[in-house]
Amino acid sequence: MIAIIDYGMGNIRSVEQALKYIGTEYIITDDKKEILRSDGVILPGVGTFPKAMGVLEEKDLVCVLKEVGSLGKPLLGICLGMQLLFEKSEELQNCNGLNLLPGVIRKLKVPYKIPHMGWNELKKEGEISLWNGVEDGSFVYYVHSYYADCPNEIVYGASEYGVKVPGFVAKGNIFGAQFHPEKSGEIGMRMLKNFKGVVEAWKSSQLSI
């Protein structure tokens, strides 16, 4: 069972439809107990970083998401949800994030239209299980004005938009997609299926303990 975090700032329905499409069990929730009972977590997000962190704090979900990280449970952040996984953001004001990944969220300062919106090529920068069946140079769908300034060792896929944009990051059980896999056609569905596989493997490992 995958828990989709519902905190009022996520692209919940499109993520829900994607999980239905790949045939996985899910629950949409902001309940701490249900989140901790799940086998994997998806944190979507649309909006501003400070407001999102404020809502997560109000709902007492910051500590829950940090506990998910410490338990080794697979956690996937999408778009703003990915950005929230980092140490802090410069959006509107300096604001602390979940600190599950090293790095800072910075504003795109490029001679192109902002937000970065539409399809862009995603180049692999390392091998990871979520790449299974995904070709290097596949096109994925972005909508964002900020990007992650983070260590290269956690970047597994990147796009160019006047600056290197980390499109997919990972460290241990923590995964993040700056693009929207749920809006990226069959490539996105493949990556979500691979995340489902990671979740199922984690569940099996817990049952064998």
Curated annotation (Swiss-Prot):
Keywords: Amino-acid biosynthesis, Cytoplasm, Glutamine amidotransferase, Histidine biosynthesis, Hydrolase, Lyase
Species of origin: Bacillus mycoides (strain KBAB4)
Domain Glutamine amidotransferase type-1 span(s) in chain numbering: 1-205
Classification of source organism: Bacteria, Bacillati, Bacillota, Bacilli, Bacillales
The enzyme's E.C. designation: 4.3.2.10, 3.5.1.2
Subunit structure: Heterodimer of HisH and HisF.
Listed GO biological process terms: L-histidine biosynthetic process
Matching NCBIfam families: IMP_synth_hisH (TIGR01855)
Gene Ontology CC terms: cytoplasm
Pathway assignment: Amino-acid biosynthesis; L-histidine biosynthesis; L-histidine from 5-phospho-alpha-D-ribose 1-diphosphate: step 5/9
Name used for this protein in its record: Imidazole glycerol phosphate synthase subunit HisH
Catalytic reactions on record: 5-[(5-phospho-1-deoxy-D-ribulos-1-ylimino)methylamino]-1-(5-phospho-beta-D-ribosyl)imidazole-4-carboxamide + L-glutamine = D-erythro-1-(imidazol-4-yl)glycerol 3-phosphate + 5-amino-1-(5-phospho-beta-D-ribosyl)imidazole-4-carboxamide + L-glutamate + H(+); L-glutamine + H2O = L-glutamate + NH4(+)
Functional summary from the UniProt entry: IGPS catalyzes the conversion of PRFAR and glutamine to IGP, AICAR and glutamate. The HisH subunit catalyzes the hydrolysis of glutamine to glutamate and ammonia as part of the synthesis of IGP and AICAR. The resulting ammonia molecule is channeled to the active site of HisF.
